[in-house]
Amino acid sequence: MKSVEHIIVCYGDQLGYHHGAKYQILSAYERWYNRSNSKICVVTDSPKLFKGYPCRVLTLSKEKKSAWSLNGLQHFGIKLQGLKWAMETTDSDASLLLDTDMYWKSDPAPLVEKINEKTIIMYRNEGTIIGSRNQSHNRFEEGLQAKNFRLGSNQQYSLESKSEMWASNILGVLSDQVDLISGAFELFSSLEHHVAAHTVEQFSVSEISRISGIQKLEGKNYLSDWSSTGRKNYVTPILREFFARYGETDFDTHLANWNHIKIRRPFVTLLKQKISKKLS
């Protein structure tokens, strides 16, 4: 059985992202994260918020955030470089990154065992780029078609008929595959200036793995999320109230009470949100 480090990258002024990271840890800890072969790493610019939590913390400086976001052009570069940093400093066999608005509904161990030199885990396949009806995908075709980009010292990249978009809400790799993530960040740094979309980071991971002959498996069936706007508007104040009540750093108290947090929206709330959206 592989050892695994569960990685969360969270930063910025919005507490909801940090609270989401904590909820992710709390909801999985007693079931899966406290196993002898499991560790947790949080890459954050707010290390004090994770004091007392059973994780190692890598502290993001302003300089790192600026460089990794291409001087503020696109913050998702911080996610890639944060993952790379965690991979470079872990002794676990595999590194498994989740976005802060995701949480496990099934044991992640079977997913971890599928990770190898030729297989990584991503959230889901969102389809090919060329000829897509997806408006966001079209921006890649518009921005990249008939262009070549330098990749490394002796490679070139160009959009191909096999180019696909894979979501990176989850990203599972062997911890020694640092070059894969480095390549993804290099491609991200080149493409970001040419594509008017916020998904260049995950596209870059998808493309580098394809070029490298590495297959991608979907991990979506193992996860639940609160990533939609409606869910975020419901969950964020609930988490804020929880940590206001119990404090930010009392892990044992959080662990004893986290299951009182109701992530799923009541039907009445969902209905009100839909009506409000239609009227706005």
What function would you assign to each model-found segment?
Residues 1-69, 88-91, 267-280:
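N-terminal anchoring/stem segment of glycosyltransferases
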Residues 21, 73-76, 198:
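A conditional alpha-helix N-cap/helix-loop micro-motif detector
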Residues 65-73, 129-136:
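Short, charged, surface-exposed secondary-structure boundary motifs
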Residues 68, 77-82:
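Glycine-rich, basic loop-to-helix element that forms the pyrophosphate-binding segment
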Residues 80-134:
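GT-A fold catalytic core of metal-dependent nucleotide-sugar glycosyltransferases
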Residues 122-147, 264:
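A short, conserved beta-to-alpha structural element at the edge of catalytic cores
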Residues 151-241:
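Catalytic core and acceptor-binding pocket of nucleotide-sugar-dependent glycosyltransferases
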Residues 233-280:
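Long, low-complexity C-terminal extensions of enzymes
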